[in-house]
């Protein structure tokens, strides 16, 4: 199975707005296949609610995206930690069992707040904002590739991949490396 995440925010960004520096274009992909080993993707959850549909969107007829930064930050810093706790609970695991968290790259402030809410050191959260900014749907596969290329992944590591998107949609997966 091929999982692709890609976004081109440069096409819907107002370059005169202060939020223009937060986003970047990107694409990432992951190939998943069934195996008999004990590694790989073994649990996922996905949640959605429509109440945030106007908080981050491109409205019909508009050239640029509109974002309510306060609402986005509030949702990300509550939904992501709740999602992390839920996937761990469903699998009888704790944060102590997780080798690293590979999250959606919203902003550095959002990621730091998520670490605070989860009561973990920020060093447990992987980032690549400094290289690519927020590439939306591409952030998790891009970051996973970067972490792998840096040699930070070891056989048996438990990765927690977590993301949030417009609308609101959010989810998490557990992956044994």
What are these regions (language model features)?
Residues 15, 58-99, 109-119, 143, ...:
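Conserved active-site "lid/cap" helical segment
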Residues 99-177:
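Claisen-condensing/thiolase-fold acyl-transfer catalytic domains that form or cleave C-C bonds
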Residues 9-12, 169-171:
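Short glycine/serine/threonine-rich phosphate/pyrophosphate-binding segments
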Residues 1-7, 157-162:
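A short, small-residue-rich loop immediately preceding and capping a beta-strand
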Residues 4-5, 51-55, 108, 137:
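Acyl-CoA/ACP chain-elongation machinery
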Residues 9, 15-78, 82-85, 164, ...:
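Condensing-enzyme catalytic core mediating Claisen C-C bond formation in acyl metabolism
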